[in-house]
Structure formats: C-alpha cells, structure tokens
Amino acid sequence: MSTLHKVKAYFGMAPMDDYEDEYYDDRAPSRGFPRPRFDDGYGRYDGDDYDDPRREPADCPPPAGYRGGYAEESRYGAVHPREFERPEMGRPRFGSWLRNSTRGALAMDPRRMAMMFEEGHPLSKITTLRPKDYSEARTIGERFRDGTPVIMDLVSMDNADAKRLVDFAAGLAFALRGSFDKVATKVFLLSPADVDVSPEERRRIAETGFYAYQ
C-alpha cells in the first residue's frame, strides 16, 4: 500500500477494506517443529534414555562404611570380624599372693613376740581392756594405779565416748608420772612410771597386734 493511498483512506477518500497493514500480514518464520501449548519438553524423551539425576549409576560400588575392627571385605562377600591379638596376662598365683599379704600379726616372728613379753620384762604384765562406754574408765584407772601397763582398745566405742576416755587416760598418766602413747588407730598404751617403753617396743606392739587376741 502506497503512502498516498494510506492518506486517502485516513480522510475517507478511499475504502477501508483496501487498507492493509503489513503488521498483521507479517508472520514470523516458523522455527523448528511445532510444539503444543504448555509443552514441558518431556514428551521428546524415551523412558529408557531418561537419566534421573537422583539415581546412582548401577555399576557404582556401594559407599564404604566404617571398617574399624573388620577385615577387608569383597564387593558382595560377608563381613568377617578381625581377630585381635590379646596379650597374655599372667595369673596371680595363690602362694605368692599369700606370701605378699602376710603382714601385721602374721608377719611377726612368734619367738620375738614371746621374748618381748617373757617373765621379767616390763611388758610381761601388760593387759588389754576394751571398754564399751565411758563407765569403764574406773577399771582402766585401777589397773594403771596398780602399776600394770594397760592397752586401751577403743575400736568398738563411738568417737564421742572414745575422746572422753582418751582425755581421762592422758590426765591419769600425767598425774601418776606415767606415759600415754598411741599404738594404732583408736588403740593406746598406758605405761606406769617404772615401766619404760621404747619406741621400738611400741612399734612391735603395733606390728604384732597381740592385744587383739587377749
């Protein structure tokens, strides 16, 4: 359509049917093959050719897990636990254990024990008292006043009464010019003034534990 004809049609000098717009006649060239509306593109692929990215390849080996303590395994073989070598530990012998545990009263030579308390030795008259409560303090005082060495075994007493009896014995030994010594836990030796007990003899008394059998 010429420009002159367009002007005539605009002012009504030419019929409108003759007006043709090149815009409407222009068609874009067809590219490729026709596609239906809302084509998602999946119709062009066959089911066998489609690879799901979430699916692992069939020929890939399974992921290796933690193999601590297990031997190497084949691809489809069973898992066998690895055998660890255990160090051999020596078993304690009953005889050696008995020899090592022989201490205290059993470790003391009975002959040495008899020599220490033989006739004429200051400790030959020693006596052991095991008071149950503080009311037996009178018996301890009487034995000590008569010149007899006294061992007080306070193991069976509660701490409160044992403390009172220790204070009483310490005051008694001080008043009569004797000595008051600790032999073992909650075990004390009261020695009169004419009985001299050396540290070695106190150690032997503790080691022999003879007061536990009197």
Curated annotation (Swiss-Prot):
Subcellular location: Cytoplasm
Origin: domain of life: Bacteria
InterPro entries per UniProt: Cell_div_SepF (IPR023052), Cell_div_SepF/SepF-rel (IPR007561), SepF-like_sf (IPR038594)
Biased composition (Basic and acidic residues): 36-58
One matching Pfam family: SepF
GO CC annotation, single: cytoplasm
GO biological process: division septum assembly; FtsZ-dependent cytokinesis
Sequence segments annotated as region (Disordered): 23-70
Key words, A-Z: Cell cycle, Cell division, Cytoplasm, Septation
Family named by the database record: Belongs to the SepF family.
Oligomer and partners: Homodimer. Interacts with FtsZ.
Function, in words: Cell division protein that is part of the divisome complex and is recruited early to the Z-ring. Probably stimulates Z-ring formation, perhaps through the cross-linking of FtsZ protofilaments. Its function overlaps with FtsA.
Entry protein name: Cell division protein SepF
